[in-house]
């Protein structure tokens, strides 16, 4: 459930707050910020295709989610650095890759994992449970990240997302390693 909640915490947190970030960090107007934000979900399609392609090579959903979270962590770190003068183009590129990777994780936890575990648990129930965890992450990001931004700024918001992503990466890779050692 950690993977699902953190996935939408990052994905929907950025979708919700990107217009404000672009306006405050880079001085973009409201219209430009909104239009650029509307493009982010398009990267989700590529995230779904990426998850399918990676699933051919990495069959363990824990490891696959962990690998995607490693990528998310690097991109979030890059996003943090881009706020220090790298420019809006690099920031938008990183936001696109982050969106792609977050959608890939979402596919892993709401579709691939339940199918992989179908012999042990009702896959429909598990998919619904994971989907509900994604909504918990979305809700936490909408309110929580706004509060953090108001109190400590956008760098703190990205650091919180980065911490959650690193924790998820470590959990996924560790769980995959424990499973293999059995």
Language-model segments: which ranges?
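Extracytoplasmic gate region of multi-pass secondary transporters
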Residues: 1-51, 106, 110, 141
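A membrane-interface helix-boundary motif in multi-pass transporters
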Residues: 145-166
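C-terminal transmembrane helical hairpin of 12-TM major facilitator-type secondary transporters
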Residues: 61-112
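A late C-terminal transmembrane helix in Major Facilitator Superfamily
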Residues: 117-152
